[in-house]
Amino acid sequence: KKVMWDAYTRVSTSTGNRYPEVSRLLKQQQQAGALIMDYAGHGVEYQISHESVLTISDFRTFTNQNLPLWITASCDVMPFDTRKETIGETALLNAQGGSVAFWGTTRTVYAYYNKFINNAFLRHVLSFTNGKPTTMGEAQRLAKNDVISTGQDRTLNKLQYSLLGDPALALNLPTFDVVIDSINGLPVGGKQDIILKAGSVARVKGRVMRQEETLAGFNGQMTATVRDTREMVTCKKQEETSNSAFQYYDRQKVLFNGSDSVRNGEFQFTFAVPFDINYASGSGLINVYAVSDDHTQLAHGAEDRFFIYGSETVRNDSIGPSIYCYLNTPSFVEGGSVNTTPYF
């Protein structure tokens, strides 16, 4: 989920400007169990952003069960060597929620250099070393080395970043792949374009793979999210110092989110394409996450080699569905005898 402050309405209060919708979205992602919460912007040890989108009180009261890794490319969010209470320490020490680890800064840092070390850390912490997810401590070491060997001096912020948490801990990354084989009977990546139209029904088939082979022993549950085409989002230019409105691309519409079973490494699901699509020719996106019944195997994958645009010709059906009601059993007849607590 990409959340850009200025894309949402700013509210002026007696204590300063606020983005209530942004605060709600971030807390929602935290509660839902995001794998990583990554923030880039202004901050201090007691709040994130000038607009107090999240405060140290929020990190103290989070009650989420699935703990994310928090990353803050921001000034002074976790100066743990001071006597002040900090967001980083509070998130890590929250016994009811917060974060599994916190990677952030202890001193002032500069935005231009932040993006390089932030991207490097993300790349490594989401990668594998010797077939296993890279530990957070190793990801930090590799990220700090990366900014040294780029051919430019991008090391200015390097010593300000620290990891609060167990350096031997790694994220619970999926180790198997999910592949979408066909949509509406057409092979993905084939010669014929796959087009999903508003009002149509899509039938998707796929597999869980290991080293180019179907993982036939995988049985469990998969969750699929289908997103609409990318669209240009223009921010509101609510910051007085901005010369122009910031623009970025995002997939803002979720067309389907649902789960189904995986049997012998194979799955299929069906969904109706809603009518409120973007109606701009472009590729859609399917994300799939699967977990085995015993929760020991994880798989994920994505597919964007299909298009979403246009409308399906839908037959005008003005006749409502038939509904049949009965008590206890479908063979019930009107006026029949039932017990004192019949099942309706």
What is each residue range found by the language model?
Residues 314-344:
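N-terminal non-catalytic regions of secreted/periplasmic and cell-surface proteins
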Residues 1-259, 263-272, 280-282, 288-313, ...:
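Cysteine-dependent hydrolase recognition
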